[in-house]
């Protein structure tokens, strides 16, 4: 399971497993704030095909093809498009894409930080941890879940403190 904004982290993380059909690849996009129509999840929300930065891809856009504003607690996932590689993986069914809201990511951040005993994840992989937390109870106890914790929370400390009501 990997977070997906533009998609480079997931592409690198999945590289070793992409040819193994028995391994499910799950990409988690930024669903934005709960109750808001703004998000950064073009794959999950069936955004139309468009061109962004010279590449054809799913893009969050208006009826005229103009890029729309996105919103996410995670600056690293706050992006209106996604790599053409992920568009291909979605279309072929090789990867499954979902999203986690800002609130789900923050809850996952707190749970992982409290219980795992390693450096707290940044807000990007907290979206992936949110998906792992959602699906784990539905899986066999023999199932192995691997989550890419691709950054630590030091870079997000101001956002996290603000959202949790702490002063820095």
Residue ranges and their predicted role:
Residues 18-24, 137-141:
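Secondary-structure transition/capping motifs at alpha-helix termini
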Residues 113-148:
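C-terminal structured "cap/appendage" subdomains that terminate the fold
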Residues 147-168:
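Glycine/aspartate-rich loop-and-adjacent alpha/beta segment that forms the canonical ThDP
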Residues 22, 27-116, 162-168:
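Active-site/ligand-binding loops adjacent to catalytic centers
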Residues 30-33, 125, 150:
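Short, ordered loop/turn segments at secondary-structure junctions
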Residues 1-3, 98, 121-124:
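Glycine- and other small-residue-rich loops at beta-strand/loop junctions that grip anionic moieties
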Residues 3-14, 35-37, 126-132, 154-157:
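Short glycine/serine/threonine-rich phosphate/pyrophosphate-binding segments
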Residues 1-9, 25-28, 143-149:
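A short, small-residue-rich loop immediately preceding and capping a beta-strand
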């Amino acid at each position: 399971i990997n977070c997906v904004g533009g998609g480079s982290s997931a592409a690198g993380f999945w590289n070793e497993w992409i040819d193994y059909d028995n391994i499910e690849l799950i990409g988690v996009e930024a669903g934005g704030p709960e109750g808001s129509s703004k998000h950064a999840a073009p794959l999950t929300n069936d955004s139309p095909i468009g061109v962004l930065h010279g590449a054809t891809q799913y893009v969050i856009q208006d009826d005229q093809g103009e890029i729309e504003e996105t919103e996410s607690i995670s600056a690293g996932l706050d992006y209106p498009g996604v790599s053409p590689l992920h568009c291909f993986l979605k279309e072929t069914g090789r990867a499954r894409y979902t999203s986690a809201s800002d609130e789900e990511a923050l809850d996952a951040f707190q749970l992982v930080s409290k219980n795992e005993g390693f450096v707290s994840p940044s807000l990007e992989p907290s979206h992936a941890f949110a998906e792992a937390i959602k699906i784990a109870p539905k899986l066999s106890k023999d199932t192995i879940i691997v989550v890419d914790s691709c950054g630590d929370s030091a870079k997000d400390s101001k956002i996290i403190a603000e959202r949790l009501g702490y002063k820095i």
